[in-house]
């Protein structure tokens, strides 16, 4: 930690902005650490997909002084029913995910389901892909 004008500045910090439910202290610590999470952006290719049975999610606000470009960014962590963590910074993925998650939680809270995560070519940016998900 660096000090400046007698205040402590953190070079790296993670704050939980929101979560799908109230978290215990242990869960708060565990979910803020996404270093051991499966990175959706890196583990999906244009040719395959991944199935996740979501149980919870956490939205994290990250500050990283050493980041190239934007030092403040958001990470979305999805926790599956087996306790595995998946992380992405993709707004398009999380927008679709939260629509599915909230609808299922409200209209069918006891129904088990999975989401299929996949990459799609961007229509707006040639040669670029984005990740999204669908209910299966």
Model-derived regions: residue spans:
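OB-fold ssDNA-binding interfaces and closely related basic DNA-contact patches used
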Residues: 1-83, 124, 132-136
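GIY-YIG-like beta-to-alpha core
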Residues: 86-99
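Short nucleic-acid-contacting surface segments enriched for D/E, G, S/T with interspersed K/R
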Residues: 96-116
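Short, charged beta-turn/beta-strand-edge "cap" motif at the junction between a beta-strand
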Residues: 106-107, 116-136
